[in-house]
Amino acid sequence: MEKPSRETFEGNNKLLIGIVLSVITFWLFAQSLVNVVPILEDSFNTDIGTVNIAVSITALFSGMFVVGAGGLADKYGRIKLTNIGIILNILGSLLIIISNIPLLLIIGRLIQGLSAACIMPATLSIIKSYYIGKDRQRALSYWSIGSWGGSGVCSFFGGAVATLLGWRWIFILSIIISLIALFLIKGTPETKSKSISLNKFDIKGLVLLVIMLLSLNILITKGSELGVTSLLFITILAIAIVSFSLFIVLEKRATNPLIDFKLFKNKAYTGATASNFLLNGVAGTLIVANTFVQRGLGYSSLQAGSLSITYLVMVLIMIRVGEKLLQTFGCKKPMLIGTAVLIVGECLISLTFLPEILYVICCIIGYLFFGLGLGIYATPSTDTAIANAPLEKVGVAAGIYKMASALGGAFGVALSGAVYAIVSNMTNIDTGAMIALWLNAGMGILSFVIILLLVPKQNDTQL
């Protein structure tokens, strides 16, 4: 049977399932470690600092390299980059489970970050290339279920698997899912940009981006420990500022930049990407609220995770509803409604001064609104970003969009954790949690304002 060409191939359910399975290798499986930190400490006989590095480094490296991977997908092939990403996940998972050596755990998690960097922009580009109109919006809904839904389920999933089967089974299952994804994607004709010449890769831009983001991450996670007046803190801050400035200058002059700032001339794309960064940042809600109910109320990790079940159920249900709202009202209204509902949920979860029973009720309702809001927002936002990118730059555009997701989550968790720790030490746990959750609500409010100002009422999508 003759293999279909790029011109004749139409995206089908087989390919879509393969794409979704590849996406959840990061958002569901790799992110599940957030709920098994104490178990990893015992298994690897190491301290919590080392484990926290291993947990956070995946999202950080994904965010740092996702834009570059998007450019590579445009140039060398989106199917090829997706397959490379899946294989990297298998390799990273194997390194994590084969020994009790902390260094291999960190290296494995780093490789999983590179895997996610390859998979996310490449799969979005495949959807852009092979699905049209309502089929694309449906495909993006399922992609969003894999990403937003996976992130909602990961904490509960990780705890359940670790309790019932052992934590290594998280990555054994991830390897199995990866192999199935490779099989389902096999046979799909390659898609790449026809107009981009194979210029030299922007290594200088990538190096500066990595230096800048690593510096910022150190400042956020270790700033209070270092002291803001210490020479080391000031030095790292200077490195972050200088590398950021050099990066902007270099990228504007480069003929083949890592980040094409021309994409941000489109207000709809800018609004979707910036709001996506901020709403991924509210992932800090989970770590703050879970830590508070365990330390402040004496709940177990399973009990803490159970409070957020309404979140994961609602985000999975509402993603398809968000797709229908997109088709009916365009992108702006669902994005605004989703963000507003999320802010209400944040405010309810932040009421840590209430008596235990009332707070638990507020938490359950708050998580319900939290998931409802994210579910409504997800598909319209993703569709806005992808539809407003020119076809020859869709890989880079998708890469920037997903960089916003990964870095928003990484820095949101880091900031929330830092604020919680600092304020708790100065006052008490209740106040520390409340202020940290207000920070997350503030990010939601800022996201709402950005959508209101930048995303047009009737989006001129390039379908």
From Swiss-Prot:
Cellular localisation: Cell membrane
Keywords annotated in UniProt: Antibiotic resistance, Cell membrane, Membrane, Transmembrane, Transmembrane helix, Transport
GO terms (BP aspect): response to antibiotic
InterPro entries linked: MFS, MFS_dom, MFS_trans_sf
GO MF, one annotated term: transmembrane transporter activity
Transmembrane as UniProt keyword: yes
Any one GO CC term of the record: plasma membrane
Keyword hit for Ion transport: no
Function: Multidrug efflux pump that acts independently of NorA and is one of the factors that confers resistance against diverse quinolones and chemical compounds.
Name by which UniProt lists this protein: Quinolone resistance protein NorB
Protein species of origin: Staphylococcus aureus (strain MRSA252)
